From Swiss-Prot:
One of its GO terms (biological process) is pentose-phosphate shunt, oxidative branch. Belongs to the glucose-6-phosphate dehydrogenase family. Pfam families: G6PD_C, G6PD_N. Cytosolic glucose-6-phosphate dehydrogenase that catalyzes the first and rate-limiting step of the oxidative branch within the pentose phosphate pathway/shunt, an alternative route to glycolysis for the dissimilation of carbohydrates and a major source of reducing power and metabolic intermediates for fatty acid and nucleic acid biosynthetic processes. D-glucose 6-phosphate binds at residues 151, 181-185, 219, 238, 337, 342, 373. The active site is at 243 (proton acceptor). Keywords: Carbohydrate metabolism, Cytoplasm, Glucose metabolism, NADP, Oxidoreductase. The gene is g6pd-1. Pathway: Carbohydrate degradation; pentose phosphate pathway; D-ribulose 5-phosphate from D-glucose 6-phosphate (oxidative stage): step 1/3. This is Glucose-6-phosphate 1-dehydrogenase. SUPFAM superfamilies: Glyceraldehyde-3-phosphate dehydrogenase-like, C-terminal domain, NAD(P)-binding Rossmann-fold domains.
Length: 497
């Protein structure tokens, strides 16, 4: 581990919900990733807290299974781990936990500052009671205390505002770090660099030259036994209201005054406030059924899902931004589970010039595609003369595939970056309270209408492209799909788009 500029301080990372899946699959592996990169402060303590009674040896064995890397480093990292079982709604449990933390902190030599980072890897239903416990017993007396909160941040505007209000009574906004892990992904961070560091793009970045922008999130797995939890939220709350809206705001916002976190968020909030109400006539909802062979369970067959559930596992919606740059140009957001592939991307389709010289209607549009995952890449689809004696046109691309361009590429996990930024106190990749509020203002009326009218989702087969109506919606708003085109052309990962 590395010494920070403030080497006379201790960092205690406290993971609430340490026995849960999120902590095991994301939080601890991210901390281990930072440890491997020597990015944790030299005086670091990692303390887990949960209701489950687990012996420390069993706890470390459980965490170890999710860690990948050098075995000796893994042993060293596991030596940093501690675990305590206690209640979430009892002050005495937090007081006892505080004594244990203090005892560990006092073992550190030559330090006079004790910083604490709290990671709430817990269900949203207990955010408030755990926050009260942190505030009442665990705040550092000599150092900073910061709190990382995982989504979902409420399930509608009213519950989100209640959560923001209650947390605001306990912590200052500068000490709250609301995680949307998509903001930590390499390609999402690259969106601003591509836009504002390359002079070739900004003159084209408007309705004058772009016909549509499609932001897509596809998973090739279903709910896999988590249907009971998923059914409480649905795909719009789970993905579109947060991940995809964050990407949209970065793609569409005006240039910020600076790269300061508040300046960037100010522009994102301005942009979000320009989004017009979503029309139900411009929304497609879907729910996956079994695969054509009947081997994979349908959503309604998942344990915990009511047999009459109308919760969508797929959604597509058209967004209209009422500002000079984008007025009249559609943004199409799509997300779904149990589809034909795993993919997240931004697809910017350009208009043809008015004096287009080629008559073939099948000629594809120019597209700038930013592949967020998997296989991070940026590629520009162009038209070129096909080599030979005939004057035929074919589609090709200028391609920046990260793993081809950058040797020995080892991209950090999004959670690694976000935890590191919270240690630094950098809010650039986190969600501010007013940003969260306007996001719920956009989606709550739509969600209320869907639930009030019990709108039935369109069925689609597990492993398909999704509801047929979604492709029809895109076509209606000017998106032209390039059939038969493979990217990358010589890779088995290529997908026809």
């Amino acid at each position: 581990m590395t010494s920070t500029p403030d080497s006379r301080s201790v960092l205690t990372v406290i993971i609430l919900g340490a026995s849960g899946d999120l902590a095991k699959k994301k939080t601890y592996p991210a901390l281990f990733g930072l440890y491997l990169r020597d990015l944790l402060p030299s005086n670091t303590i990692i303390y887990g807290y949960a209701r489950s009674h687990i012996e420390i040896g069993d706890f470390k064995a459980r965490i170890s299974k999710g860690l990948k890397g050098d075995e000796e480093k893994k042993k060293q990292f596991l030596n940093l781990l501690h675990y305590h079982s206690g209640k979430y709604d009892e002050k005495a449990s937090y007081d006892e936990f505080e004594k244990l933390i203090l005892a560990e902190e006092k073992k550190q030599q030559g330090v006079d500052k004790f910083n604490r980072l709290f990671y709430m890897a817990i269900p949203p239903s207990i955010f408030i009671e755990v926050s009260i416990g942190i505030h009442g017993s665990l705040i550092s007396k000599n150092g900073w205390s910061r709190v990382i909160v995982e989504k979902p941040f409420g399930r509608d505007l009213a519950s989100s505002r209640e959560l923001v209000s209650e947390l605001g009574k306990l912590f200052k906004e500068k000490d709250l770090f609301r995680i949307d892990h998509y903001l930590g992904k390499e390609m999402v961070q690259n969106l601003m660099v591509l836009r504002f560091a390359n002079a070739v793009f900004e003159p084209l970045w408007s309705k004058s030259h772009i016909s549509s922008i499609t932001i897509t999130f596809k998973e090739d797995i279903g709910t896999e036994g988590r249907g009971g939890y998923f059914d409480q939220f649905g795909i719009i709350r789970d993905v579109m209201q947060n991940h995809l809206l964050q990407v949209l705001s970065l793609v569409a916002m005006e240039p910020p005054v600076s790269l300061n976190a508040d300046d960037i968020t100010n522009e994102k909030v301005k942009l979000l406030r320009c989004i017009q109400p979503i029309k139900m006539s411009e929304v497609v909802l879907g729910q996956y059924t079994s695969d054509p062979e009947g081997k994979i369970p349908a959503y309604l067959d998942d344990e915990g899902v009511p047999k009459d559930s109308t919760t969508p596992t797929y959604a597509a919606a058209v967004f209209h931004i009422n500002n000079p740059r984008w007025r009249g140009m559609p943004f199409i957001l799509k997300c779904g589970k149990a589809l034909d592939e795993r993919k997240t991307e931004v697809r910017i389709q350009f208009k043809r010039p008015d004096n287009f010289l080629f008559s073939d209607d099948d000629i594809s549009r120019n597209e700038l595609v930013m592949r967020i995952q998997p296989g991070e890449a940026v590629y520009l689809k162009l038209l070129s003369k096909k080599p030979g004696l005939e004057n035929k046109i074919e589609q090709t691309e200028l391609d920046l595939s990260y793993r081809h361009r950058f040797e020995n590429l080892d991209l950090p996990d999004a959670y690694e970056r976000l935890i590191l930024d919270s240690i630094k106190g950098d809010h650039n990749l986190f969600v501010r309270d007013d940003e969260l509020d306007v996001a719920w203002q956009i989606f709550t009326p739509l969600l209320d209408q869907i639930e009030k009218e019990k709108i039935k989702p369109e069925p689609y087969s597990f492993g398909s492209r999704g509801p047929k109506s979604a492709d029809e919606l895109s076509k209606k708003f000017g998106f032209i799909r390039s059939l038969g085109y493979n990217w990358p052309g010589n890779s088995p990962q290529g997908s026809k788009k």
